[in-house]
Amino acid sequence: MIKDIFSIYNWDVVILYECTCDDIDYIIKALKEIKCPNKFIKEALDNLETCNLNIGLTYSNIALKSSIIIINKTSSFAQLINTISHEYYHLICHISRIFKIKDEEELAYLNGNLNMRSYKIVESLKREVDS
């Protein structure tokens, strides 16, 4: 598992890449730390315990301005990009809702900043998936 922890828009973000079944305890603990409701934790656990590839989850605690994004191992680099894009969209929606960001250009910059932030990690994962 690769961890990336940062703040953007005064919002704390933890992204866990390349998660497997071995990481479930850590993931559940991280979700509990940001006061994730038990209902979502159960749903996350049900998904993660399948040990399937290509699973992504995002949980945001709006009050804490904090999010956790989980990206399981993927079957291909294309699927990795798809999963990351999908989960980033959830994060962008959560941030934009709280900060009332409606300007498309500002949202596009937020998306770009997230992608630039993750570029080196994604690039290293591309080499791993391609080999």
Language-model segment annotations:
Residues 101-131:
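Post-HExxH zinc-binding segment in Zn-dependent metallohydrolases
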Residues 1-49:
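Non-catalytic terminal regions of proteins
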Residues 78-79, 83, 102-106:
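Short, conserved micro-motifs enriched in small and acidic residues
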Residues 62-64, 85, 127-131:
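Disordered, low-complexity tails and leader-like regions
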